[in-house]
Amino acid sequence: RRDWARFADLHPAFRMGDDREVGCYAATIDFVRGTLPAGGVQEVVNHWQALRDADDGCTYAASELFSARQLPALEVWRKARLSAEANRQRATRDAVAIAAPDVSNLVADLYANPAKFLGSRVAAPTRQRQELVVLALIRLAAKDPDNAAALLESKWGVQLSHEERHWTWGVIGKQAALRLSPSAMEHFDKVAKDSDLSDDLLGWKVRAALRAGDWKAVHR
């Protein structure tokens, strides 16, 4: 019900500090009151991106912070990417609806048939369209990483930002590594900046490097 006054009264007595959604509600109250501490926005990001399923608390907090220009669009899109990789369509749509509400209806299309979604488009001229392409490539990689890699290499890579391209190669590399494919490290080698990857993707890059005997990549 978002009864913030009642929540503020009860929250100090709440002992389960590991509830991410409650933490986001508390951050929302602090933000509304103007008492959100330094690092509060990052805490919301950490809670939100760690949740696999769609939620109200962190999604609402992220929406409020984004509307107030306190939350970078990149973090919202990264939440959408993480949700797409986890096959959580509602959570993906919720994130897209924050950053780009006018294209959130397209999430259903890229989930239903990512190859068709990518094949029906010639270009991605805007940030929103680029990110939808990234989401579609992530969904395609879950089913067919080789096809996703081919499309990224031949068509979409030049249209994406460096960060978008690196993240997508990381996801494709992870999916290849999950299948014990020898091509996994080839995909990860296309990531020129490791800081563009999530901790999870970095972990999979190390696993792929170990399997390939690429000790230089392991120590990087």
Regions from the PLM with identified roles:
Residues 1-220:
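Alpha-helical solenoid repeat scaffolds
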